Amino acid sequence: EQKADETLLTKEAELVGIYMEGPFISMEKKGAQNPLYVHKPDAEMFRRLQKEADGLYRVCVVAPEEPGAMEFIDSVKGEVRVSVAHTTADYDTAKEAFEHGARQVTHLYNAMPPFTHRAPGVIGAACDNENVMVEMICDGVHLHPSTIRTSFKMFGKDRIILISDSMMATGKPDG
């Protein structure tokens, strides 16, 4: 009789999708991304990478203030879910990106301008558009508990995706 752990070891993992967090981001808000790989939004580059990845890219991050970003969103929105992130975008630019077809915000509050009473930025634009989902890293490091509670009141539970950010800040090695 085979043990459960032996059965697991004989099966291979299957990659079901890739989250493309870069290279189409703002150099100013690149976060932990390697600056050598930051690139202006480029639909043909995306398609080459998508082909090399056997079509596994499911989400592609873009900073909408970058030159060519709106055209990029228009071009790829039918091929991949476009998410706004690593951005210096103001409210109007983010709103325009959502109108062009971006449907998500990666790492809400992180690597983007803060939400203020006179400059609501990406956060305010996302809140105003019912078609936009937002991701939050609720690890006790990235967001204050009050920010998490307030976000649930702003967006509602059906528009929030809870994620981890598996990188060095979690206290674990890459991988």
Where are these regions (language model features)?
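Histidine/acidic-residue-rich, glycine-tolerant segments that coordinate divalent metal ions
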Residues: 2-120, 171
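Active-site-adjacent C-terminal substructures of enzyme catalytic domains
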Residues: 93-175
